[in-house]
């Protein structure tokens, strides 16, 4: 389920978050702002959440982390909540737990320890290291294997994508990255590739307009972000070479919320011959 499909720019969509349900597990990959509220609005079982996997530590991928730790517990989560991520994850989760300490105690004081089991209030960090241009299996349980792999989001390091495997089925989540050879290798013959995308032609027009308007700061930001994301033609070519069965695009910059932008995307994605989905918040994809 593509819970959140947006970038940091304001809009109706939630920031990045993808839910994966597999063999009794409920995982979330990234938890940007708005993901918690969107998860509940979609009717997803937040109290059953047992794993969060972070791709990197930009705000639009992790800003709802304290919120989801707290909200899932307050609403009735009785299982442990495990957080997985590359280098620096432990300090991040410890900070979130510390931030919530007073709030958690207020809940116990009001509702009692029988209702609010304080032992489940804290999230449990699982930090791992992925070397450059390499991958590591960092989760194996109940027939599920999850592999983290290095992606290209420089100067943001670490940054990873994830390969989820179960009974011969494969789903790959790119995280934020420019075109990446290792990602292409990991995505080979996968059932679904969930990949970020940037409409570079639109960004260049936006950059030109900001320059003409004298918006130096915003112009610099729009210029800079183009060098660590993947363009439409690039992601289409990668998916075609990797023989991806279905391409689901998220972290859409800009959001394809009108027919003009949507058609610009589709016109530039013709290099992929398989099914393409410009994801909306709440879209569901089933791998059989």
Regions found by a protein language model. Give the residues of each.
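Short, solvent-exposed mixed-charge patches
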Residues: 193, 287-288
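Cap/insert and terminal regions of metallo-dependent hydrolase folds
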Residues: 161, 167-170, 178-280
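Binuclear metal-dependent hydrolase catalytic cores
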Residues: 1-172, 178, 261-287
């Amino acid at each position: 389920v593509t819970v959140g499909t947006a970038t940091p720019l304001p809009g109706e969509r939630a920031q990045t978050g993808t839910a994966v349900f597999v063999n009794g597990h409920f995982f979330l990959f990234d938890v940007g702002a708005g993901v918690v509220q969107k998860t509940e609005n979609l009717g997803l079982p937040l109290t059953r959440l047992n794993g969060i996997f972070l791709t990197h530590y930009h705000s639009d991928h992790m800003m709802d982390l304290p919120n989801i730790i707290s909200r899932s517990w307050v609403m009735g989560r009785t299982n442990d909540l495990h957080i997985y991520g590359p280098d620096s994850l432990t300090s991040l989760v410890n900070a979130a737990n510390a931030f919530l300490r007073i709030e958690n105690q207020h809940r116990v004081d009001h509702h009692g320890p029988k209702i609010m089991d304080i032992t489940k209030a804290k999230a449990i960090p699982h930090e791992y290291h992925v070397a450059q241009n390499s991958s590591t299996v960092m989760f194996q349980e109940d027939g599920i294997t999850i592999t983290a792999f290095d992606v290209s989001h420089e100067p943001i390091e670490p940054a990873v994508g994830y390969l989820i495997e179960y009974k011969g089925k494969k789903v790959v989540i790119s995280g934020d990255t420019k075109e990446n050879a290792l990602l292409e290798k990991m995505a080979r013959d996968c059932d679904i590739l969930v990949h970020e995308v940037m409409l570079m032609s639109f960004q260049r027009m936006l950059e030109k307009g900001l320059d003409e308007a004298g918006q130096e700061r915003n112009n610099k930001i729009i210029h800079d972000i183009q060098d660590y994301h993947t363009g439409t033609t690039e992601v289409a070519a990668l998916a075609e070479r990797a023989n991806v069965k279905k391409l689901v695009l998220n972290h859409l910059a800009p959001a394809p919320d009108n027919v003009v932008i949507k058609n610009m995307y589709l016109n530039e994605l013709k290099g992929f011959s398989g099914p393409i989905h410009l994801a909306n918040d709440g879209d569901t994809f089933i791998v059989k």
